[in-house]
Amino acid sequence: MAETEKIEIMNFDQDGYLEDGRNLVETGKLMCDLADKVADEGYDAVFLMGVGGTWDELMQLEYLMNKFGDRDLEVYLIHAAEWNVSGHKRMTSNSVVLTASESGTTPEVLEAVKKMKSMGVRVIAMTSPEGPIGQAVGADMCVKMASDHGAGGCEKGYYLADCFGLRLLNRRGCFPKYDLFIEQTKDIWKDMLDIRKKFEPTAEALAKKYALAPYTMFIGSGALWGETILFSMCILEEMQWKRTRYISSADFFHGTLELVEEGVPVVLFKGEDEKR
């Protein structure tokens, strides 16, 4: 394959990424405060709402909250476009919704937020307070998700969402090591840079070998299932027009296996949880 352009993982503002990380730790404290506010007020159910990539990102929090939560905790992952046409019978004025929009203009999320607010539902948004969604939610219920330097990836959204969700669990007595989680992740941004640097040669080799494959399969599970979908759909299909097939490890042997043949790359996302 002739190389027409060289793309490097580390070709971004690394100092800016680290600065964003430091700022994000402070922003995470705001998410913790919002979780405390919700816990103090009380709630009957937690809804995690996204569309496209944000829906994929929130999937890991749904997994964690259901894994560590008590039997009375109700957590639902909802797709904004689907909720707009079908609603959800368990959503009441005592429910709380966490959503996200880096642009602040996602049409489906904006429509849903307006409807939810009219129902008296509390909505917390990871978005700019100046955007349409932020204005609909209210500045006091917004935490800015977008990075100031345009560097990095979904890990920033993951971090903020987890600060909120895991704090709710902590307040229920279900996640006692919340403070340890915050302490151990405060410097993770440097580690993320180191991982990128170490993976650069491998990434280049994989890209050269598989870039022109007719389509590629991605298998994931557990906390990584949402990331499996996001990488396949948002990174490869949407951004690079690559044909992909994402499948859960639980379902792989019930159909998709029959399509594995010579020339079709299969990528396995190997997590650290019980579904690995």
Task: Indicate where each model-derived feature is located.
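Conserved N-terminal alpha-helical segment that immediately precedes and caps sugar-phosphate-binding
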Residues: M1-R276
